Amino acid sequence: MSAYIIETLIKILILVAVFSALGGFATYIERKVLAYFQRRLGPCYVGPFGLLQVAADGIKLFTKEDIIPQGANKFIFTLAPIIAMVSAFVSMAPIPFFPNFTLFGYEIKPLISDINIGFLFFLAVGSAGIYAPILAGLASNNKYSLIGSARATIQLLSFEVVSTLTILAPLMVVGSLSLVEINHYQSGGFLDWLVFKQPLAFVLFLIASYAELNRTPFDLLEHEAEIVAGYCTEYSGLKWGMFFLAEYAHLFAFSFVISIVFFGGFNAWGFIPGGIAILIKAGFFVFLSMWVRATYPHVRPDQLMNMCWKIMLPLALLNIVLTGIVILI
């Protein structure tokens, strides 16, 4: 029992350290990608190819003054970014990032908890992060923060419904909520990937994921031209950095989950080993989010809600019905 606890604690430390570092590095990659699309250079002065820009940004965040606005609720103002970080990293617990491997004669499972309701746990804990923008907006004593938190409540709750209903169809096909079982279901090869059996579910879940992640063109929670930085307007320094890292941690988590559910996960991909294959797939979806950000303009709140409730929700329900009919036949 003690060995299991020690192993779990080590896995948690590795997960937090690795994805925190990746979150910082992803800022550099995203700025370079956006610069390429916009015919700019991007970061290029700090270190070779601008690689040390990440370190410079980190030093800036850690040394900035932590300002709490006058009239703000200090406890809730501080609690909000902690909730964002905790929900982002805890939601990764049931995600199998790689195949099992042996180290010094000991089999290592590269996930924190192999529970049979892994996907439900991922959605539930990830959606708990909605309290972060709500509390941040309410505690900041700022009108723009309050508008941002109101938008967060509407947008995240709406798309949480869509993403949950959308994923029911693939889960009906597999017959399990375990992400490990979903991965094993697609072990037969390329044609067993669920994206070919549930293409509509994949498209709907991808769009809903970007909306839940607050990625452009769905970043209504912090749209600079309308509400400054939304619920983050009054945050600075380390607290703002925690919101920032939480957003990227959610992006990585959703990228891995989409790769596992629809694209064969860590099963070997031809001559490519499974561990490398899932990194390629997840990396592609991280890049795709940056590509979408550089390509599409913002949508209006009313357009987003119309798309959610009048288009995506009926399509998700229709897909569930059709999948059930096919399974019965």
UniProtKB/Swiss-Prot annotation:
Reactions it catalyzes: a quinone + NADH + 5 H(+)(in) = a quinol + NAD(+) + 4 H(+)(out)
Subunit (UniProt): NDH-1 is composed of 14 different subunits. Subunits NuoA, H, J, K, L, M, N constitute the membrane sector of the complex.
**Where does the UniProt annotation locate this protein?**
Cell inner membrane
Put simply, this protein is called NADH-quinone oxidoreductase subunit H
Give the gene symbol: nuoH
Q: Which keywords does the record carry? A: Cell inner membrane, Cell membrane, Membrane, NAD, Quinone, Translocase, Transmembrane, Transmembrane helix, Ubiquinone
Q: Name one GO biological process term.
A: aerobic respiration
Q: Which organism is it from?
A: Helicobacter pylori (strain J99 / ATCC 700824)
Membrane protein topology class: Multi-pass membrane protein
Q: Which domain of life is it from?
A: Bacteria
